[in-house]
């Protein structure tokens, strides 16, 4: 986690397929450059249970093999996403979320908002070294998910107690990687990021 392509790779005639679950609707995307874009709604759009697919039928029709009808995107496109019973609740809440986004200024406004949050947190991670250390190369950092570790893992219990006391939830990183992961999806206000930064600054001052 914590890695994001800051550019769209040039794949020539080969259709580009992208899982945009984490940053779908977080910034403008030139969809014409992709053969397939897909993403789970549960990051920036709404609750779990819905998946978004954008695809070019001309570039995805020749699979070279037999597919289950449910896995053939052309069937869903031909039936206007009603090939089977849709997850009504997830779709409805996603609609409400997108109405909120529109009132906030749309995807361009989300990009500005998200960049400010990421700059705030990554700035703290870099400034508070060597107590904290980012796990991703600067040029590959994800705007949506910032990952970092403590240089001294023996201090993790003390840091965990501090951020939990501040009302922060789910900061622990993936169990296979360890460390910490701060998710900053569209709905998260910058004030919440500031709470984490304040906790980190307090901890670094005490343990640096």
Region annotations inferred by a language model:
Residues 17, 31-42:
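Conserved active-site segment immediately N-terminal to the catalytic lysine
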Residues 7-11, 28-32, 43-47, 138-139, ...:
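Solvent-exposed alpha-helices and their adjacent loops that cap or buttress functional pockets
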Residues 131-162:
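Conserved PLP-binding catalytic core of the aspartate aminotransferase-like
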Residues 1-24:
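Active-site phosphate-binding strand-loop segment of PLP-dependent enzymes
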Residues 41-122, 137, 206-208:
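Active-site C-terminal subdomain of aminotransferase-like
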Residues 131-135, 168-173:
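A short linear hydrophobic-aromatic micro-motif
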Residues 55, 148-152, 184-186:
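Short beta-strand-to-loop capping motifs
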Residues 165, 174-208:
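PLP-dependent enzyme catalytic core of the Aspartate aminotransferase-like
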């Amino acid at each position: 986690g914590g890695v994001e392509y800051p550019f769209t790779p040039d794949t020539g005639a080969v259709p580009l397929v992208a899982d945009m679950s984490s940053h779908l609707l977080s910034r403008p995307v030139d969809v014409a450059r992709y053969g397939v874009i897909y993403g789970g709604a549960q990051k920036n759009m709404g609750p779990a249970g819905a998946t978004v697919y954008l695809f070019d039928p001309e570039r995805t029709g020749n699979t070279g093999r037999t597919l289950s009808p449910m896995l053939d995107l052309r069937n869903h496109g031909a039936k206007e996403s009603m090939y089977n019973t849709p997850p009504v609740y997830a779709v409805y809440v996603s609609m409400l979320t997108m109405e909120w986004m529109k009132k906030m200024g749309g995807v361009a406004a989300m990009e500005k908002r998200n960049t400010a949050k990421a700059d705030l947190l990554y700035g703290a991670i870099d400034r508070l070294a060597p107590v904290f250390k980012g796990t991703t190369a600067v040029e590959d950092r994800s705007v949506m998910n910032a990952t970092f570790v403590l240089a001294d893992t023996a201090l993790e219990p003390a840091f965990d107690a501090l951020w939990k006391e501040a009302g922060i939830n789910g900061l622990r990183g993936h169990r296979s990687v360890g460390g910490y992961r701060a998710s900053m999806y569209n709905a998260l206000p910058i004030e919440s990021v500031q709470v984490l930064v304040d906790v980190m600054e307090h901890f670094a001052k005490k343990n640096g």
